[in-house]
């Protein structure tokens, strides 16, 4: 079993490049199923285990997938007749596999997708996806752990008001509606940059989508879509993690590919703490020294503070003075990293959906285990400043969302190794 071992105390300096966004590439890969004419080529694709999983799902659905890892590119040819069923053996590994349902319904008029797995954080229900498909005219029923969807008269444009701005549901409905008859309106839509990237991709394929990035998205259905070449946007969560690595070690690093507009809620909090940020055309420079100020954070749907940055920000707040409160409103069960931080001598108490951090914690190296993807990164960040040696296990979580994080940190001056036991 792999582990990452960190000896804390080194300031990070230098330059590091952000990979393509995991949360953009997965829906965009599934959207490639919409192209009945010509293959699509996606570039700036991060080399992640989740990308391999979704590629396997697409192959099962009868798409030809060529993964050119050395070029960070994937070519998807979905011009043949697609299979209707995404089986449990793949879908169980990753929740994003549910995103094949929209494209399959759009292309075939029917789909069978196993109920998803792959995430330890809360229940992440799929009711909003189902609500959207039913509004578009599909009949849905659940049986033997599968979702059966059938739109025997085809999908028809409609108005859909989401109860919550679910990212996955917004993406799935956009994809289904892109080939539906007539106009679809999604109200209370998710506004993440990854939604905008998906809409841009489908528009490049010949789609007619407006309003992505706002509350209301309009999709005018078209007859068919064709493959194109598209570059995936940079990963704002990786960028944020690297900015925090610079700040937590009181270092000075340039994060190439970090886009301020994609992570405004994070950078404003960092500035409030006294972290110095310099915004350049192709990235963000982060510098920090001395004591940082306490701030409170509350996770919210975009453009609020991202839940995917909560645990990393908590690591940074442990090194700041004063009283801090971290409130998680997006997912239940997302404080599992707190118990691991406590093993490192962190002063944190959880009360319901809030974690209270008292004073500056004198972090000490310890053996800890990653409980989810972002917790893995957060524990590594804490290890960068802990006194002594920190060992982080359960790295399969980390590999789902970060490409060579330990290698990047080492290149910036961290004393860090990945060891295969």
Curated annotation (Swiss-Prot):
EC top class, as a word: transferase
GO CC annotations on file: cytoplasm
PTM sites of type 2-(S-cysteinyl)pyruvic acid O-phosphothioketal: 119
Keyword Plastid listed: no
Enzyme Commission code: 2.5.1.7
InterPro entries hit by this protein: Enolpyruvate_Tfrase_dom, Enolpyruvate_Tfrase_sf, MurA_subfamily, RNA3'P_cycl/enolpyr_Trfase_a/b, UDP_GlcNAc_COvinyl_MurA
GO MF: UDP-N-acetylglucosamine 1-carboxyvinyltransferase activity
SUPFAM superfamilies: EPT/RTPC-like
Protein location: Cytoplasm
Biological process (GO), any one: peptidoglycan biosynthetic process
Record-linked Gene3D superfamilies: Enolpyruvate transferase domain
Keywords: Cell cycle, Cell division, Cell shape, Cell wall biogenesis/degradation, Cytoplasm, Peptidoglycan synthesis, Pyruvate, Transferase
Pathway note: Cell wall biogenesis; peptidoglycan biosynthesis
Entry annotation: catalytic residues: 119 (proton donor)
Domain of life from the UniProt record: Bacteria
Binding sites annotated in the UniProt record for UDP-N-acetyl-alpha-D-glucosamine: 95, 124-128, 308, 330
Residue numbers binding phosphoenolpyruvate: 22-23
Keyword field contains Cell division: yes
Pfam family of the protein (one): EPSP_synthase
Catalytic activity: phosphoenolpyruvate + UDP-N-acetyl-alpha-D-glucosamine = UDP-N-acetyl-3-O-(1-carboxyvinyl)-alpha-D-glucosamine + phosphate
Family label: Belongs to the EPSP synthase family. MurA subfamily.
Physiological role: Cell wall formation. Adds enolpyruvyl to UDP-N-acetylglucosamine.
Official protein name in the record: UDP-N-acetylglucosamine 1-carboxyvinyltransferase 1
Originating gene: murA1
């Amino acid at each position: 079993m792999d582990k990452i071992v960190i000896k804390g105390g080194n300031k990070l300096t230098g330059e590091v490049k952000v990979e393509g966004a995991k949360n953009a590439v997965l829906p965009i890969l599934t959207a490639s199923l919409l192209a009945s004419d010509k293959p699509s080529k996606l570039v700036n694709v991060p080399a992640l285990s989740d990308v391999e999983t979704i590629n396997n799902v697409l192959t099962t659905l009868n798409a030809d997938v060529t993964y050119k890892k050395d070029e960070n590119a994937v070519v998807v040819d979905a011009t043949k007749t697609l299979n209707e069923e995404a089986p449990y053996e793949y879908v169980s590994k990753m929740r994003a596999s549910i995103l094949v349902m929209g494209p399959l319904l759009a292309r075939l008029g029917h789909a069978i997708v196993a109920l998803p797995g792959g995430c330890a954080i809360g229940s992440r229900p799929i009711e909003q996806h189902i609500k959207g498909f039913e509004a578009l005219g599909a009949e849905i029923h659940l049986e033997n752990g599968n979702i059966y969807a059938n739109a025997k008269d085809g999908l028809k444009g409609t108005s859909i008001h989401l109860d919550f701005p679910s990212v996955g549901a917004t993406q799935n409905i956009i994809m289904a509606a892109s080939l539906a008859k007539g106009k679809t309106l999604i109200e209370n839509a998710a506004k993440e940059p990854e939604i905008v990237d998906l809409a841009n991709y489908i528009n490049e394929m010949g789609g007619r989508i407006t309003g992505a990035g706002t509350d209301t998205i309009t999709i005018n259905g078209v007859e068919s879509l064709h493959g194109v070449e598209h570059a995936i946007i940079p990963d704002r969560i990786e960028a944020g993690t690297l900015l925090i690595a610079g700040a937590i070690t009181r270092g000075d690093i340039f994060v190439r590919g970090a886009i301020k507009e994609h992570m405004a809620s994070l950078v404003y909090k960092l500035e409030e703490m006294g972290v110095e940020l310099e915004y350049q055309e192709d990235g963000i420079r982060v510098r920090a020294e001395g004591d940082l100020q306490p701030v409170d954070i509350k996770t919210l749907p975009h453009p609020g503070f991202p839940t995917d940055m909560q645990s990393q920000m908590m690591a940074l707040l442990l090194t700041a003075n004063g009283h801090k409160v971290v409130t998680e409103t997006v997912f239940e069960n997302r404080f599992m990293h707190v118990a691991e931080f406590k093993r490192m001598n962190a002063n944190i108490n959880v009360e319901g959906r809030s974690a209270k951090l008292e004073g500056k914690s004198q972090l000490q190296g310890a053996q800890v285990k990653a409980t989810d993807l972002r917790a893995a990164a957060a524990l590594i960040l804490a290890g960068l400043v802990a006194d002594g040696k920190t060992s982080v296990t359960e790295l399969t979580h980390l590999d789902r969302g970060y490409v060579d994080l330990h290698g990047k940190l080492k290149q910036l001056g961290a004393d860090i190794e990945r060891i295969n036991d």
